[in-house]
């Protein structure tokens, strides 16, 4: 995922926190805010120092970024997302992180449904 698609500035984080909607599961909290003129979604990541050491926190962030990269075609491009990792995320592998993110994005109804062509 390109760096221009990441949320880095505190003002941008605060805007999404204040105006956006949130939804959560045990591992992640996701805030989302609709941006009308955006051509691509942006994501911001937050992993507290209470969660593991730096290696563990960076691994979680890599897993989240890669999950969003793989789900890119299903994610609404007009939104900004902030993902906050909770403690249970520290013990998860990539596939568990991706599955948990899919679940929380479906809860928030921001994930497009795949067309069902199994007939």
UniProtKB/Swiss-Prot annotation:
InterPro entries: Ribosomal_Su5_D2-typ_SF, Ribsml_uS5_D2-typ_fold_subgr, RNase_P, RNase_P_CS. One of its GO terms (biological process) is tRNA 5'-leader removal. The keyword Protease does not apply. Keywords: Endonuclease, Hydrolase, Nuclease, RNA-binding, tRNA processing. Its EC number is 3.1.26.5. GO terms for molecular function: 3'-tRNA processing endoribonuclease activity; ribonuclease P activity; tRNA binding. The keyword Nuclease applies. GO terms for cellular component: ribonuclease P complex. It catalyses: Endonucleolytic cleavage of RNA, removing 5'-extranucleotides from tRNA precursor. Disulfide bonds: none annotated. It holds the Pfam family Ribonuclease_P. Consists of a catalytic RNA component (M1 or rnpB) and a protein subunit. Belongs to the RnpA family. HAMAP family: RNase_P. RNaseP catalyzes the removal of the 5'-leader sequence from pre-tRNA to produce the mature 5'-terminus. It can also cleave other RNA substrates such as 4.5S RNA. The protein component plays an auxiliary but essential role in vivo by binding to the 5'-leader sequence and broadening the substrate specificity of the ribozyme. This is Ribonuclease P protein component. It comes from Listeria innocua serovar 6a (strain ATCC BAA-680 / CLIP 11262). The gene is rnpA.
